[in-house]
Amino acid sequence: MTPQERRSSASLALIFALRMLGLFLVLPVFALEARKYPGGDDAALVGMAMGIYGLTQGILQIPFGVASDKFGRKPVMVVGLLIFAVGSAIAAWAPTLHWLVAGRALQGAGAISAAVTALLADQTRDVVRTKAMALVGASIGLMFALSLVLSPFLASFIGLHGLFAMTSALAVGGIAVVIWWVPPEPEKHVDQARGGVLSVLRHPALLRLDFGVFVLHAVQLSMWVALPAMLVQAGLARDQHWQVYLPAVLASFFVMGATLFPLEKKGYLRAVFLFAIALIALVQLALWALAHTVAGVWPMALVLFVFFCGFNVLEASQPSLASRVAPAASRGAALGVYNTLQSLGFFAGGAVGGWLVKSAGAQALFLASTLAMLAWLGVAWGMDAPAPKTGLKAG
C-alpha cells in the first residue's frame, strides 16, 4: 500500500471501529438486560429492538450511497454519524422497551456504511482493496472482541442506558476522525450514471453478493437471540461469556490471515469463499444439535471458533468483491444496495430470530439458519473466480 492508501484504510477503519464498538457493546447483554424493561419478557419485542436498527439502516443505505456519489462521501458520513449519535442518546434515555425500539431505529437511520466503503474503494487500487477491506473487517472484529470483554463488566455498573450513552460519545468521536484525519476526497468525482441504481440491480454478480450478505448477517444476528441463554444453561455466567467469545474471535483472525490472503494470490478465492459458506452452514447444524440438550462450554466454544473462522473470511472478501465489480460511476449506489441487504439481514435476523425462539424454540432458529446458509451456497456456487485486479464475472 502507498502511504495515502494506508492513511485512508486506517482512518476509515477507525470510523467503522468507533461506530461498531458502540453497537457491539450492547449486543452480548442486550437480550438479558432488555428483560429489565417493561415488556422485556417478550422475546419477539426484544428481537425487534435488536433488529429494527437494521431495517431503518437498510431503507436509507441506497439514498445515503447515492447522496455520497452526488454530494461527496465525507459530508454524508458526518450527517450519518450525527443521526446515529442522536439515536444512541434516545436509546440511553429510553424508559421503556418501545422507546428503546425508537432509539435503535434512529441509530439505523445514520446509514454511512456505503459512503465509507465507497470512499475506501475510491482511494485504494483494486490490487490492494481486499487488504484494505480486511483491515476494516479486522477493526470491526477487534471491536467485537473488545466488547465481549467490556460489555458484561460495563453493564454491571452502568447498565444498558450507560452503554448507549457511550455509543453516542463514540459516534461524536467518529465525526472528529472524518473531519480531521480522513484524507481529502478526489477533487473530481465521476458523475453518477443515470439509472445507476437500476443497472446495479440488474448486475448478476452483485446480486449474488447482495443475497449472500443478507443471509450472512441475518444468521449472525439471529444467533445472539439464543446463544447467551445457551451459554448460561451450559453453566457459564453472563459476565464470563467473554472467556468463550474472545479466544474464538482472536484465533479466527489468525486462521483468516493464514488462508484468505495467500490463497487469494494463488487464485483460490472462490474455493475459500464457498468453503466458508459451507462451514457456517455446518456451524448452524451443530448449534441445532446442541440446542436439543444442555451443551457443555467446550463444544459451544469450538462451534463459535469455527463460526468466526468462516464469518471473518466472508466479511473481508464480500465487500471487496462488491466494490471491484461495481461500476465506478455508481459505486456508492452499488455499495448502498449491498449495505441495504446487509442491514435488512440484521433486521430479519433479530425480528425473525426472536419470533422463532418465542414460538418454536432455539432448535427451530438454528434449523432455519442452516437452510438459509445452504440456499446461499447454492446461489454462490455459480459465481466465477474473480479476475485479477477486476472482480468476478457473473456465472
Please place each PLM-identified region on the residue numbering.
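Juxtamembrane intracellular "pre-TM" segments in multi-pass secondary transporters
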Residues: M1-R6, V182-G212
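Residue-level signature of mid-helix packing/kink "hotspots" within the transmembrane helices
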Residues: G54-I62, F144-A145, V249-G257, F346-F347
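Conserved MFS/SLC helix-loop-helix module at the cytosolic interface between two early adjacent transmembrane helices
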Residues: I59-P95
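Helix-to-loop junctions at the C-terminal end of transmembrane segments
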Residues: L60-G72, F254-L269, V357
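Cytoplasmic membrane-interface "Motif A"-like loop-to-helix N-cap segments
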Residues: K70-G80, K265-A278
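Cytoplasmic helix-loop-helix junction between adjacent transmembrane helices
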Residues: G103-G141
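C-terminal membrane-cytosol helix-exit motif in multi-pass small-molecule transporters
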Residues: S168-E187, V379-D384
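C-terminal transmembrane helical hairpin of 12-TM major facilitator-type secondary transporters
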Residues: R270-Q318
